[in-house]
Amino acid sequence: MPVVAESERLPRLRALPLSPALLAMAEGRLPHPQLWRCRSGDPFYVYRGAGVPAGPELIALWDWHSWALGVRERPDGLEFLRFSIETPDRPECLARTEQGLWARLFDAMYEHDLDLDELAAIAEAVGYRHWPLQLRSREQAEPRFGDGLMHSQWLEELVAAVDAAAAQD
């Protein structure tokens, strides 16, 4: 997959239908201090020789440890993805909408044991409308999370539901 030039990254992101909060994170500004948990730095790897997956042009968002996060335009909408810099040929579609991406990021923050009131404040700061639904769904499903597989399945289903709801907005 070709990567948008580093000098064109922010203008291209600003041209997409992305929220001010997501754009701020892509610019290195955190809409809430706890969002540092979801971002380890500006895109570095994709501009310094790391391989990238084949497919449509990638617009890098940020790095998250050894993962690169990005968005690409597809005929049927946006696709948010991440890939390991060590295995770029196996990208993971995180979501098809920004709200779905927030669902993924909020799951990671929940796993860091952030206070629920703080998570609600972060949701308000970034405009994540589905946090109450996510929390209810997780509380109902969590007793079945004995192994990581059930959690992964629940998260995939949640993101699909959030993407579907966001597509109707």
Question: Residue ranges of each PLM-predicted region?
Answer:
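Compact, glycine/acidic-enriched structural inserts
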Residues: 79-120
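Residue-level detector of alpha-helical secondary structure
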Residues: 106, 120-123, 159, 163
